[in-house]
């Protein structure tokens, strides 16, 4: 039987938080390995192409390597380039396109099974983010090809009838870019208006487009059914069928709670937050740690790159301390 490769720590997820964990472990002389089902920075890669971060470069930095930007706020492409450079600098061992299927064992003696093979690891860090699983509308027709949960760019939807579901940042930005590119945009919003948390330079813009009728909006309304050539919505007054070519269901995303629960990670029944030690981010399953936005459960607006990047240091210090404690 082929001998399994051994690592001190296996990190599930190679986004900014996963990279930060790998860096801090390397700095302490440990041997980590990172796995991602897609490319390195897979979620960031799938962000809208023209995305601009609502932050300054220094707040995205990891590994004490400066990040520079042409503008006050960095964009997606600059962030991808920066994090690749950091990964190269620290020579991180990243297994791209290798999904982790499961892991078993106990603290110090885990077996990690991927699509390709199995590995040994002393500790596990789950840093898989939340961008992989969209919150579904749960309506008939959602499985049609014209329904899109990830907005990337507007060009393919020129001169098309487009419905945007939602009213937070991704929905507002997507609706504006689609409108500017020549799509006929209708927004369907569950609440009474555009979300108060929308970026300050976006919110008045989208509200003005709606006010002057350039973008149609149905507030306090929900999607009932998606059909090949239209979308049926329920408004406060009646059902309305909207002519439609594409639907952008910008209803948010969530971590893979099922994977966590299946691997002994207990979740808070109200918030779905994993139960962790706040000082170490170790879960109730010894040897399994959580990092980044998955720590926030369904409250995904509580943790961003800006604060999740510090989880790596916290976890690495905890792991190092455990490994150096005298055995009793």
Which functions belong to the PLM regions below?
Residues 105, 117-202:
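Predominantly flavin-linked oxidoreductase catalytic cores and closely associated redox partners
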Residues 3-17, 160-165:
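Beta1/beta-strand and adjacent pyrophosphate-binding region of the FAD-binding site
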Residues 8, 31, 161, 183-186, ...:
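Residues at the starts of beta-strands that form the adenosine-phosphate
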Residues 292-328:
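A conserved FAD-binding loop/helix module that cradles the flavin
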Residues 14-92, 172-200, 269-270:
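Beta1-alpha1 glycine-rich phosphate/pyrophosphate-binding loop at the start
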